[in-house]
Regions:
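Membrane-embedded alpha-helical bundles that constitute the cytochrome b-like, heme-associated redox core
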Residues: 1-250
């Protein structure tokens, strides 16, 4: 009966807020395709940091030669910026208009809903700092956070030393500021874990919403896969962050 009451509450909430099925499905889809796929790729490419500054800088330079500059920016706008903006704005609206009921029904699904909303807010704050600093302040505006050689082609790219300075690595010779230091490292640790959790937990909802996991057995399997993905991405990301924060730059 408690499950039925929870479902009834959910139905009443949905009926009273005029949520569009289409917008909810697009929100779910955008969180996985393309944003979730890009997250996995971004973690994978940044694993080069574990091999040192030269390998990381070489990876960044290689990625930026794969496509013409104009097409690269267009692809970034269409596949990352716009989906992220929609997913974030709609997610904020859902978080503000929703009414978590963990106080009345302390089921795993209700707690999952609450943690999904909280992790999404923290992830959004982290992404604003991450993109605003490394993509905009450094790459687009050319304001490096640590001493770097002047690029021969005039194209400013984020370097290993930039990221190390951003995270507060003293060996980077970067200056402690509001966008660089130990507080940023703490934000990155918390923010990346929240981002990964938000994605992997949302992956379950995506599979259920789109009918990819029908039945309890399929849903349990998806849950196991989501947890494994969370662990793998978290270990990889924390390894990268700790390497760039505490590792040598020589």
């Amino acid at each position: 009966m408690a499950d039925a009451a929870t479902t009834a509450d959910a139905l009443r909430t949905d009926a009273g807020t005029d949520h569009s099925v289409l917008w909810r499905r697009l929100h779910s889809l955008s969180g996985v395709l393309p944003l979730g796929v890009f997250l996995c790729y971004h973690v994978f490419e940044n694993l080069s940091a574990l091999r040192g500054p030269a390998a990381y800088d070489e990876m960044v330079a290689h990625v930026n030669t794969l496509l013409p500059r104009g097409f690269f920016y267009l692809l970034e706008l269409v596949t990352i910026v716009l989906p992220l903006a929609y997913h974030a704005l709609y997610g904020v609206w859902v978080a503000v208009s929703g009414r978590p009921n963990v106080g009345r029904y302390a089921y795993a699904g209700n707690w999952g809903y609450l943690t999904q909303r909280i992790s999404g807010g923290i992830a959004l704050l982290f992404l604003l700092v991450h993109v605003g600093t490394l993509r905009t302040w450094v790459t687009l505006l050319g304001n490096h956070l640590a001493p770097v050689p002047v690029p021969a082609d005039g194209l400013d790219l984020v370097t290993y030393r930039d990221v190390a300075a951003h995270l507060g690595n003293p060996a980077s010779l970067g200056v402690q500021s509001i966008i660089a230091g130990d507080h940023i490292f703490a934000l990155y640790v918390i923010g990346t874990l929240c981002t990964i959790w938000h994605f992997t937990y949302g992956l379950k909802g995506f599979c259920w919403t789109w009918g990819l996991a029908v039945g309890r057995l399929a849903q349990r399997r998806v849950t196991v896969v989501a947890w494994l993905l969370f662990v793998v991405l978290s270990v990889a990301t924390l390894s990268i962050l700790f390497q760039m924060r505490f590792g040598a730059l020589g």
